Curated annotation (Swiss-Prot):
This is Triosephosphate isomerase. It comes from Thermoanaerobacter pseudethanolicus (strain ATCC 33223 / 39E). PROSITE patterns: TIM_1, TIM_2. It comes from the Bacteria. Its main location: cytoplasm. Substrate binds at N9, W10, K11, G172, S212, G233, G234. The keyword Isomerase applies. The gene is tpiA. The active site is at H94 (electrophile), E166 (proton acceptor). Homodimer.
Length: 248
């Protein structure tokens, strides 16, 4: 059985003091969660948040990383740095990174391989735009992004990868793919992983849905056969809302 994973991506919100307050509120509300709980604060919050979540069931994620261990890469953060401050998961290839910062499939792949080689679990984001969806290209786009991201990932490592299907048109818009639609895409993703790594490995890979996930729609999403959790945006900035999602 795949253990569900619910992760809150705070994006560019929360100063360190606000971050501490948020996790302190969250801890008692999610202590009995059956799902794996991950918070993904901005880089400057990670150390403070890590101190507060020690000894709890909350795990730490980062929003991005560079693929080199060190060097003259001004403004970048390396996997070694993240590892040392207690990070377990790293979001890679979020549509906002692709859209605003020119992140390509090739860059995403380099980051995925680097994360895995340093013992970090990548949460690899894939998803189609509204125009791609309207042109009937959802499956083509999403499956291709996935194949590109996983190039060179070993059979042993694939089980440490989490995939997040985030249709771009649903992020922050209030629009959500129907649970059935999301499940169809996620099923196709799992079949693609099976074609690359075999059915047994594919059955162990967790695939989340992301895109306007909120307390009102989480149980419907989680009732589907292949949806293994959620990558939550705005709703993860309010402890009580995120807790309701985690405790679906």
């Amino acid at each position: 059985m795949r253990r569900p994973i619910i992760a809150g991506n705070w994006k560019m919100h929360m100063t360190p003091s606000e971050a501490v307050k948020l996790v302190e509120e969250l801890i008692p509300q999610v202590k009995d969660a059956k799902a794996e709980v991950v918070v993904i604060p901005p880089f400057v919050d990670l150390t403070e948040v890590n101190k507060v979540i020690q000894g709890t069931n909350i795990l730490l994620g980062a929003q991005d990383m560079f693929w080199e261990e060190k060097g003259a890469y001004t403004g970048e953060i390396s996997p070694l740095m993240l590892k040392e401050i207690g990070v377990k998961y790293v979001v890679i290839g979020h549509s906002e990174r692709r859209q605003y910062f020119g992140e390509t499939d090739e860059m995403v792949n380099k980051k995925v391989l680097s994360a895995l080689s340093h013992g970090l679990s990548p949460i690899v984001c894939v998803g189609e735009s509204l125009s791609q969806r309207e042109e009937g290209k959802t499956f083509e786009v999403v499956l291709n992004q996935t194949k590109e991201a996983l190039k060179g990932v070993s059979h042993d490592d694939i089980v440490n990868v989490v995939i997040a299907y985030e249709p771009i048109w649903a992020i922050g818009t209030g629009k959500t793919a129907t649970a059935k639609d999301a499940n169809e895409v996620i099923k196709a993703l799992r079949n693609t992983i099976a074609s690359l790594y075999g059915k047994e490995k594919a059955s162990l890979v967790r695939i989340q849905y992301g895109g306007s996930v909120k307390p009102e729609n989480i149980s419907e999403l989680m009732a589907e056969s292949d949806i293994d959790g959620a990558l939550v945006g705005g709703a993860s900035l309010v402890a009580s809302d995120f807790a309701k999602i985690v405790n679906y």
